[in-house]
Regions:
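Flavin (primarily FAD) cofactor-binding/catalytic cores of flavoenzymes
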Residues: 2-39, 43-45, 87-193, 197-445
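A conserved beta-strand/loop capping segment in the N-terminal third of enzymes
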Residues: 65-98
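Nucleotide/phosphate-binding site architecture used for ATP/NTP-dependent chemistry
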Residues: 50-57, 64-67
Length: 445
């Protein structure tokens, strides 16, 4: 067993832990290694649909927001690969997911702290350190701190959990499966960006010409991503700090209100989709027009021939049946800590709903020594807000974690922005308090 433990061991190598590794590359005194079961870096390769684009700025990359001179930036990727001037001439409003995935892979190839084909089987805390049982290592890997970044798990609705996997699968597998859907009735479940992209691919015949297309969504309509300037303020360090300070009921209320800030359909995708649907009767004469069913809650499913889906219309509360040969689930993801942490499970603090509790430094509360932390990325949507699961603030979060790890502010993490001002200023005059007392019990608009 090594006598010199790591300062940080990362479990999982997705974009979020990759960001931490990229920033730590400039800190040779910090000993860090990151482990993943995959043979090489990949990022949602099963969802790299033709024409799919990122829903955030390419400047919100692994490092630029806190260290613009870092060599692992997206701009340096363009320069080093001879793409900078062509990129400028392309004048694209958003880069493709394929290019962003290539950028992430380029960074991964240039980092020596990453260990692929090394799944972590279990983690224990012994003798003042975390001990990781890693495949390929004869002795445990010891580390003073952990950072858990194992990503997200596809959410399968309970109604669909027993359907045959060859005929009902999650959209994250789409490009791996490359299904032949020619002549089949296809139902897409889920009204977000991935659902829209799958439907667009079906309309374009990417997987063959289906006999019928049905799109079911629980949302009341197929709604756009809100990319307007003031909504984008939710994706700033100042707003995250403000959000953290609120009580849980208020945070839940805000998350419901802000859903379309992170989980809508890109307006460009919606426009293209609507135009395809408008042209469909002319371009596909004699074929049934695609059926769009928003405002439906999925109740039950039967896996016979064909698959039968039972949904309830939220408008009139009536039940409807949809029959399909294939069902593609665009139903989002779940956040779970990996099974390798089960030996530590009883030591992690949970809230009343059974969720883990990341603090302002993204460290989970546990009963171990305060100087041995378990950082977790993408586990704090309720505590840190709508930006937590997005790429937008990943380098800022990485900087917060690294500053906390090393004990001083190496990176700027307070943006100082005051537009808009989220909190009230203290009353400057006693007359303000008297005015408030006089009207405190009135209703407001």
């Amino acid at each position: 067993m090594s006598s010199q433990p790591l300062d940080l061991a990362g479990i999982g190598i997705g974009p979020f832990n990759l960001s931490i590794a990229a920033l730590l590359d400039d800190h040779p005194s910090i000993k860090a290694q990151f482990f993943d079961s995959k043979p090489s870096f990949s990022w949602h390769s099963g969802m790299q649909l033709p024409g799919s684009r990122l829903q955030t700025s390419c400047l919100k990359d692994l490092v630029t927001g806190v260290d613009p001179r870092n060599r692992h930036s997206f701009l340096n990727y363009l320069v080093q690969n001879g793409r900078f001037y062509d990129f400028l001439s392309a004048n694209m409003p958003a880069i493709s997911r394929a290019e962003y995935a290539d950028y992430l892979g380029w960074v991964a190839q240039n980092l020596t702290s990453l260990r692929f084909s090394c799944p972590v089987r279990s983690v224990r805390f012994e003798n003042g350190c975390f001990e990781l049982d890693v495949t390929g290592h004869k002795t445990p890997v010891r580390s003073r701190n952990l950072c858990v970044g194992t990503g997200i798990t596809p959410y399968i609705p309970p109604a669909c959990s027993n359907l045959p996997e060859d005929r009902c699968f999650h959209s994250i597998e789409m490009m791996h499966r490359q299904p032949d859907l020619a002549g089949e009735r296809v139902t897409v479940v889920g009204g977000g960006q991935s659902g829209a992209e799958i439907v667009l691919g079906l309309l374009d015949g990417t997987w063959g010409e289906p006999a019928g297309i049905t799109w079911i969504s629980r949302r009341p309509n197929f709604e756009p991503l809100d990319e307007t300037p003031f909504t984008n303020q939710y994706f700033t360090p100042g707003y995250v700090r403000a959000f953290q300070s609120l009580d849980e009921s208020r945070r839940r209320e805000l998350l419901r209100y802000q859903k379309l800030a992170s989980d809508g359909i890109s307006p460009d995708t919606l426009n293209t989709l609507y135009q395809r649907l408008y042209e469909y009767p002319l371009s596909h004469p004699g074929r049934p027009v695609p059926e769009l069913l928003p405002g439906r809650s999925l109740y039950a499913a039967s896996g016979g021939e064909p698959i039968r889906l039972l949904s309830r219309n939220q408008m009139d509360q009536r039940f409807e049946e949809t029959q399909a040969d294939r069902v593609i689930l665009c139903t989002g993801f779940e956040h779970r800590l990996p099974e390798c942490l089960e030996p530590l499970g009883g030591r992690l603090k949970l809230d009343q709903a059974g969720r883990h509790c990341p603090d302002e430094h993204f460290a989970l509360e546990w009963d171990g020594p305060a100087d041995c932390r378990i950082y977790a990325v993408n586990q704090g949507r309720l505590s840190h807000g709508v930006a937590e699961s997005q790429l937008s603030l990943m380098c800022w979060r990485s900087a917060v974690i690294i500053n906390h790890l090393i004990g001083w502010d190496r990176y700027p993490v307070d943006d100082g922005g005051q537009m808009p001002r989220w909190f009230s200023e203290p009353a400057r005059h006693s007359s303000t308090e008297r005015f408030a007392d006089e009207h405190r019990h009135q209703t407001y608009f």
